[in-house]
């Protein structure tokens, strides 16, 4: 399979907020934020909580893992993860008549499918042919036998 390229993505840093009830020995793989890695007194921690609330974080979010919504073409956790998106033929075809007159003065807007280029700084897309055109080895063997 010489046509496949290995895609390399930057790992997104995961930041976990540690509650005061948990010890750091229980979860050694977690990345601590700079404010947590510094030794601080309880009074300073209260000031930090007030600052984080002012920045838009909810106070109850301090003890929970940050959750990001899934969009359908998510990257895996490992560096060897590949993203493959099959193109929809209907979206690739251009209209035969051309754009409508009122659309000439407006920016063309195309619906997003979740597999567009440019989703990240180093994203590369691997395009595959239409699955209907690709024959599997099982199909070839079945046709050669009478």
UniProtKB/Swiss-Prot annotation:
Residues 19-32 have a biased composition (Acidic residues). Residues 79-92, 107-120 have a biased composition (Basic and acidic residues). Coiled coil: none annotated. Pfam families: GAGE (PF05831). Isolated from prostate cancer cell lines; expression associated with progression to androgen insensitive phenotype. Expressed in normal testis and at lower level in normal placenta. Residues 16-146 are annotated as: Disordered. Keywords: Phosphoprotein. The modification Phosphoserine is found at residues 63, 105, 144. InterPro entries: GAGE, GAGE_fam. Belongs to the GAGE family. This gene belongs to a multigene family expressed in a large variety of tumors whereas in normal tissues, expression is restricted to germ cells. These genes organized in clustered repeats, have a high degree of predicted sequence identity, but differ by scattered single nucleotide substitution. Their sequences contain either the antigenic peptide YYWPRPRRY or YRPRPRRY which is recognized by cytotoxic T-cells. PANTHER family: P ANTIGEN FAMILY MEMBER 1, P ANTIGEN FAMILY MEMBER 5-RELATED. This is P antigen family member 1. The gene is PAGE1.
């Amino acid at each position: 399979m010489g046509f496949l390229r290995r895609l390399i993505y930057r790992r997104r840093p995961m930041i976990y907020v540690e509650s005061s009830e948990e010890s750091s020995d229980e979860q050694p793989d977690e990345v601590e934020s700079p404010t947590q890695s510094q030794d601080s007194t309880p009074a300073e921690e209260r000031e930090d909580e007030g600052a984080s609330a002012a920045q838009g974080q909810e106070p109850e979010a301090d003890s929970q893992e940050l959750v990001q919504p899934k969009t359908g073409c998510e990257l895996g956790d490992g560096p060897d993860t590949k993203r493959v998106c099959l193109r929809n033929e209907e979206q690739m075809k251009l209209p035969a008549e051309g754009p409508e007159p009122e659309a000439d003065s407006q920016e063309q807007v195309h619906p997003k499918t979740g597999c567009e280029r440019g989703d990240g700084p180093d994203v590369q897309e691997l395009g595959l042919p239409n699955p209907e055109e690709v024959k599997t080895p099982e199909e070839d063997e079945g046709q050669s036998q009478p």
